[in-house]
């Protein structure tokens, strides 16, 4: 959150925190929680990650670079069924959808290209039919990270029964 304040100022950072329900966690001092909330408003899980408040880069020298709220709360019976990060925003049926890998990228990109609904799959390999079924009939552009263009182009063909995906090479 501090990085967003440094980047955009308090007002815009506050709007982003509210829009995406970004939270903090004491699991690691200053950690960020990216909640996965579906279109019904159901919280599927929370992904805990630690970022440098000055650079915004992930801190990767941790035992586990990603942790989950349901594990931190010690919920052994919890059944994980992930959805897109930002999926709750898809109640807006008008704007086209942009998919990126990282939650942080979705949040930041939403400021620069607000004509899209920005969502994230969480990693290069998490673009799949289960997460994308909610996109049926939508206009969707994929923005893979560096070196992900080929993989996501192939995935776009594989998932073409759901909707038409355009794959951008903007980040390539």
Task: Name what the model sees in each region.
Residues 27, 33-138:
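Phosphate-handling DNA/RNA-contact segment within nucleic-acid enzymes
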Residues 21-22, 29-30:
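Short, small/acidic-rich helices and loops at N termini and domain boundaries
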Residues 1-20, 35-40, 96-99, 111, ...:
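Replication-associated primase and helicase/ATPase modules
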């Amino acid at each position: 959150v501090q990085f967003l304040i440094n980047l955009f100022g308090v007002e815009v950072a506050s709007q982003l925190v509210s829009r995406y329900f970004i939270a903090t966690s004491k699991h690691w001092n200053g950690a960020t929680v990216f909640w996965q909330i579906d279109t019904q408003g159901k919280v599927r899980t929370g992904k805990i990650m630690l970022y440098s408040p000055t650079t915004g880069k992930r801190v990767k020298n941790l035992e586990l670079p990603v942790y989950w709220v349901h594990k931190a709360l010690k919920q052994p019976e919890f059944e994980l069924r992930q959805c897109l990060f930002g999926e709750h925003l898809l109640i807006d049926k008008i704007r086209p959808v942009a998919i990126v890998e990282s939650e942080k990228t979705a949040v930041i990109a939403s400021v620069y290209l607000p004509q899209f609904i920005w969502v994230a799959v969480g990693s290069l390999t998490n673009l799949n039919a289960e997460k994308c079924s909610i996109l049926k009939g939508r206009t969707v552009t994929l923005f893979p990270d560096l070196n992900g263009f080929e993989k996501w182009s192939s995935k776009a063909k594989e998932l073409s029964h759901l909707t038409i995906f355009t794959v951008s090479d903007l980040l390539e």
